[in-house]
A protein has these predicted regions:
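Acidic, glycine-rich A-domain
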Residues: 1-209
Length: 209
């Protein structure tokens, strides 16, 4: 709606700020059931070039970049101890506050520089910068790893160096047969596709023993 035109056809309309505000409130109200975990979380958004291509669940105009920003904001607004970062082939500075409207968040994420995809970076960054995290939540698409160290190895290195049994949740916004998590490690989980139940499932996984 905020773009003032449809993805299909030639329909156009005047964007009304009050409607944008109402849609924003409705989006967050839909996730009121998501409860905070009380854990320390690093929330990482993949901003690589492939995140701006294709569509999610056959919805025209809903790219992995838009979908991941929307879902990540649920966790960002719900949790009190959360650090939001962005990455591609390197860590990318991101300036987003909890009180920003969803359309503004999507716009800011869309303006970040593109690059490759290295899903190990959030763990390596946290280790290098002495960030204590009980869980890493990574939103990406189907291109999940193109770095020098596998994300599983990066998480294990973080656990070993910090002594924190951190968990890893990787959300692949585009459904395919990807897998990053070690199936033998109960502290890792892959989530595939765009699902409104994901934030609640992720919260339950983080607090589970």
């Amino acid at each position: 709606y905020g773009q003032g035109h449809g993805v299909r056809g030639k329909g156009e309309w005047e964007v009304v700020p009050e409607v944008i505000d109402a849609l924003d409130r409705a989006f967050y109200l839909a996730f009121q059931a998501v409860e905070p975990t009380g854990k320390r979380i690093v929330l990482a958004l993949d901003v690589s070039g492939s995140m701006n291509a294709g569509s999610i669940a056959g919805i025209p105009g809903l790219t992995p970049r838009i979908g991941s920003a929307a879902m990540a904001m649920i966790t960002y607004r719900t949790e009190k101890q959360v650090v939001l970062v962005a990455f591609s082939g390197k860590m990318v500075p991101v300036d987003i506050s909890r009180c920003q409207r969803l359309d503004d968040v999507v716009r800011r994420v869309s303006n970040l520089p593109f690059g490759g995809t290295d899903c190990a970076l959030p763990m390596l960054w946290a280790l290098e910068n002495h960030v204590q995290a009980d869980a890493f939540i990574i939103y990406t698409d189907s291109d999940t790893w193109d770095g020098h160290i596998h994300p599983v190895q990066a998480l294990r290195k973080y656990r070993e160096k910090t002594g924190i049994p951190a968990k890893l949740i990787v959300i692949g916004m585009v459904a395919n047969k990807f897998s990053i998590a070690d199936p033998l490690d109960a502290g890792m989980m892959d989530v595939v596709g765009f699902d409104t139940a994901a934030p609640q499932v992720i919260s339950q996984f983080i607090v589970a023993d």
